[in-house]
Each structure stands twice: as C-alpha cells, then as structure tokens.
C-alpha cells in the first residue's frame, strides 16, 4: 500500500515535467511548427486587422530560429516585408542571466510605417544586417558586441507635423556599459524632409568602420580606438529656390568626404581626438585636401597642439590653448 502511494505521488509530481518536455520536443517537429505558424499568423491577423503572412518558421535545437517570407499588409500598403531572419542564441548561459548570441542576421527587409505614427512616415529597405555578441550580462547591465555589419540600407523619414510634443519629465537612470568591438557599414543612406519649411537633409555612406568603441552610459564616458568613413556625401537644402553662385548656406552639397579619427575619448573635461585624415569637396568649389592634427583637454586646459589644413590653393597651421577662462591662439600665415 505504501509503495503504491509513493508511486502515485511520484507520477503526480513528474507529470508536469514530462508534459513540459513533450511540449518542448514537439516544438522542434516540422509539422507542429507549420501548424503553430498558421495559427499564430491567423490570430495576429485577426487581432490587428492586418494581413500577416509567414512562409516558414524553423526552430532547431537548442535555440536556432529561422523565419522566412514575412509580410504585414494593411491595404493598400505593405508595412513590412522580410525575406529572412536567423537568430542563433546559446541556451545554457540564459540560465545565468547572460546572453551569448552566435549570430543574428536579417536579409532583404522593407519597412513602411504608412499612417501608423502620428506626424511622421518612415520608409526604408535593409539589404543585410549581421550581429555577433558574446558577453551580454543582464544583471550587471554590460553588453559586448563583437561584430555588427550593415549594408545596402536606405531609410527615408518624412515629418508631416513639426509641432513639439510635451517633454517627458520622467527620468530613469541608464547604467549600461556597451563595448562595440567592430562595426562596418557599406552603402547606407538616410534622408529626412520637413515639409513645413521645405528642409531636406540626405547623407550617404559608401563605407565606414568603427573599432573598439566603448560607452559607459551611467558615467557618460565614451571612447573609440579608430573611426574611418569614406565615399560619403551630405546634402542640405532649404526652400525651393535655385542654389546661388558660390557658397550658398541654404544649399550645401558635400561629396568625397573621408574622415579618419584615432584614440578618441570623452570623460567630462577629459577629451582627446587624433585627426588622422579629413578631406571633402563642396558644390561651390570649396575643397579641403587634408586636415590633420590633435585635440586634447583635461581638467585644466583645452589644447590643440597642432592642426594642419591644406586646400588646393593654401596651407594653414594652427596651435591653440585655453585654460577655460583665458586663451592663447597662434595662427601661422597662409602659404
């Protein structure tokens, strides 16, 4: 009798665990995944009033998720189109409050906010995005991003209403520390338009790289080892009038921008930046062949030990120093 009682108690205690294990195993079976995909898409469509389609969902052990062929349609607009999303996360570190991301990749994404957001419309396409992160510590608010790559991405922002919104006075302290080891951009552009004053801003980056960047959001400390951007253009236009001859502040068109910076950091009054290279051309004919130098500051002084500017027709050397109250600037004569 006692053995039978122990047996029944054991079954009662083990049944929820067994059911949970069976459920988890079922999630990895393709027919079950296909059924859940259809049911989830149908439920989401009914709840949102939109047409939501998902061509394929594939979950592989332990946490490797592949989603293909996602469409979100609110006639006549397609709000979201996604060719593929792949998320590969290690399972065991999650039980320790850590996130180890082997790979997150997005391919061929198109977004159109239509009228979902008051006062603005966002449209864009994303060609490819990849992220690898080993060292996200949720309890201690630390994130290490080993690699992030973004390419063939173009975003348009149209602001229909520039009325200022009430400022949110609620404050929450952000304590995260972010360590970005490597970031690469290729063929990325952004444009913004404010119809109220006909202001248009557009920027295109052909290639950009950031290495060893750090951000301590609690203490407001920032730094990076190197930054390089090339093949960049920036356009700024206000009004509908044709650009005036020469330099026109209402119509600025910079092209062939190349910027190289090293050893940058910002910690309150402690700042440093090495300008390794800078060059650009403007629509008006203004051209900077080269700009190199260094900027340095601490609790006592702000100093430009050397800054050299070269244009096609002139050269200028600059040194400057200030003690936050008094300044001494020396500029050599152009040659």
Question: What do the PLM-derived regions correspond to, one by one?
Answer:
Residues 56-160, 172-195, 204, 211-237, ...:
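Flexible beta-edge/linker motif
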Residues 77, 282-288, 310-315:
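Solvent-exposed loop/turn segments connecting transmembrane beta-strands
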Residues 275-278, 301-307:
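Transmembrane beta-strand segments that form the barrel wall of outer-membrane beta-barrel proteins
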Residues 292-295:
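Feature captures outer-membrane beta-barrel proteins of Gram-negative bacteria and organelles
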Residues 1-49:
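N-terminal type II signal-anchor transmembrane helix
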Residues 162-169:
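Intrinsically disordered, low-complexity segments enriched in small/polar residues
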């Amino acid at each position: 009798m006692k053995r039978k009682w122990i047996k029944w108690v054991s079954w009662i205690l083990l049944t929820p665990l067994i059911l949970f294990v069976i459920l988890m195993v079922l999630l990895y079976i393709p027919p079950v995944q296909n059924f859940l995909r259809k049911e989830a898409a149908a439920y989401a469509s009914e709840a949102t009033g939109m047409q939501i389609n998902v061509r394929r969902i594939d979950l592989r052990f332990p946490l490797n998720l592949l989603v293909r062929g996602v469409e979100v349609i609110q006639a006549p607009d397609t709000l979201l189109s996604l060719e593929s999303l792949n998320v590969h996360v290690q399972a065991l570190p999650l039980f320790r409050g850590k996130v180890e991301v082997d790979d997150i990749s997005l391919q061929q994404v198109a977004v159109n906010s239509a009228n979902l957001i008051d006062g603005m419309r966002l449209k864009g396409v994303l060609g490819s995005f990849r992220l690898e992160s080993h060292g996200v510590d949720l309890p201690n608010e630390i994130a290490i991003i080993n690699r992030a790559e973004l390419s063939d991405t173009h975003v348009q922002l149209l602001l229909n209403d520039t009325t200022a919104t009430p400022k949110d006075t609620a404050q929450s302290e952000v304590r995260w520390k972010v360590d970005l080891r490597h970031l690469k951009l290729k063929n990325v552009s952004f444009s913004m338009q404010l119809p109220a004053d006909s202001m248009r801003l557009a920027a295109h980056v052909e290639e950009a790289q950031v290495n060893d960047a750090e951000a301590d959001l609690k203490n407001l400390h920032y730094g990076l080892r190197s930054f390089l951007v090339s093949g960049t253009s920036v356009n700024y236009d206000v009004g509908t009038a044709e650009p005036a001859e020469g330099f026109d502040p209402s119509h600025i068109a910079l092209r062939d921008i190349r910027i190289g910076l090293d050893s940058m950091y910002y910690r309150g009054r402690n700042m440093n930046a090495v300008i390794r290279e800078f060059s650009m051309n403007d629509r008006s004919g203004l051209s900077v062949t080269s700009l190199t130098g260094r900027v340095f500051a601490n609790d006592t002084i702000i100093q430009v030990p050397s800054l050299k500017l070269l244009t096609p027709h002139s050269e200028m050397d600059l040194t400057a120093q200030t003690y936050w109250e008094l300044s001494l600037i020396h500029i050599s004569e152009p040659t």
